[in-house]
UniProtKB/Swiss-Prot annotation:
Broad class of the protein's primary localization: membrane
CDD domains: GT28_MurG (cd03785)
Record bears the keyword Repeat: no
Record keyword Ribosomal protein present: no
Domain of life of the source: Bacteria
Name by which UniProt lists this protein: UDP-N-acetylglucosamine--N-acetylmuramyl-(pentapeptide) pyrophosphoryl-undecaprenol N-acetylglucosamine transferase
Family assignment from sequence similarity: Belongs to the glycosyltransferase 28 family. MurG subfamily.
Purpose: Cell wall formation. Catalyzes the transfer of a GlcNAc subunit on undecaprenyl-pyrophosphoryl-MurNAc-pentapeptide (lipid intermediate I) to form undecaprenyl-pyrophosphoryl-MurNAc-(pentapeptide)GlcNAc (lipid intermediate II).
Compartments, record wording: Cell inner membrane
Catalytic activity: di-trans,octa-cis-undecaprenyl diphospho-N-acetyl-alpha-D-muramoyl-L-alanyl-D-glutamyl-meso-2,6-diaminopimeloyl-D-alanyl-D-alanine + UDP-N-acetyl-alpha-D-glucosamine = di-trans,octa-cis-undecaprenyl diphospho-[N-acetyl-alpha-D-glucosaminyl-(1->4)]-N-acetyl-alpha-D-muramoyl-L-alanyl-D-glutamyl-meso-2,6-diaminopimeloyl-D-alanyl-D-alanine + UDP + H(+)
InterPro entries linked to this entry: GlcNAc_MurG (IPR006009), Glyco_trans_28_C (IPR007235), GlycoTrans_28_N (IPR004276)
Enzyme class: transferase
Amino acid sequence: MNAPTVLIMAGGTGGHIMPGLAVADVLRERGWRVLWLGNPDKMEGRLVPPRGIDLVPMHFQGVRGRGVAAMLKLPFLLLRACSQAWGHLTRVRPDVVLGMGGYVAFPGGMMAALRGLPLVVHEQNAVAGTANRWLARLARRVLSGFPDVLPRGEVLGNPVRRDVCALPGPADRYAGRTGPLRMLVVGGSLGAHALNTTLPRALALIDPQARPQVIHQAGAQHQQSLREAYAQAGVPADCRDFIEDMADAMGQADLLVCRAGAMTVAEVAAAGVAALFVPFPHAIDDHQTANARFLSDAQAAWLCPQGELTPEWLADWLRQRTRPELLAVAERARQHARPQAAADIADVCEQAARRPS
């Protein structure tokens, strides 16, 4: 008997690709054949094939914010992409199609629905992306990482790496800690200029005896300027371009200062760590602010708009934080964790594949 086949559609950013890979791992462990519809010239082209998953090529990308000329080309690009998707679906004949977001998912999902194939859509952010808003109308099952995102949406959470889910609980980790607070600053692989410029100046305003210890990850191209900023501020800091074991780093931290991508928010909850979110203000539909509010509205994190993040504000805010308070926030964050999200999404894929068309 041939193994059942899932075609995962996701691309463009790690926020779509990484949760798709987590679901792919679960389905492969259950004996499924996994294929991936994506653009070989984009991030999925670098991340997916090394995981042993065949990439089915789809050359399509979004035009939002690219000007009038790009918008005029959209109908022709979409028609070509739909033609490619139809051909791939005819050849692959998947038992279920899983759309995890990104522009590449739109033509693939449309053609899957037109062919009568079971389509499952998962939206990671608290504000649905363009592709998923359309595909949700056609999908057999609609899943989301946050509540009240899409009509008919079932909240299953966002898949998180297993090493993050495996961390001991906050009470076990925070127990016995003494001395300065341990702060982890994560700007992502490309860094975050607002964090890189504000943190050194804020910490310089705090008495050295009360100043948190800091590990600051900011991307390779920002390392020199970041180290110079801390040196000029007279603040010792462990500056890194990449953190190999992010789960361990989060587990060791009392406080995380970071952006608010969907996967970051999910990992904060899964790890059970206190976090100050500084959402990227130029994210489409300001979805990072909506993501952060899921925890901040529950007193399970803090939210500071980037426009309000000044060295003076941050220094004053840090002076008020205590380890018992951070532990309480971390425990509330973990109450919102969904460690079984990848397995639950895989379950839905299996159910959709078994249901008759």
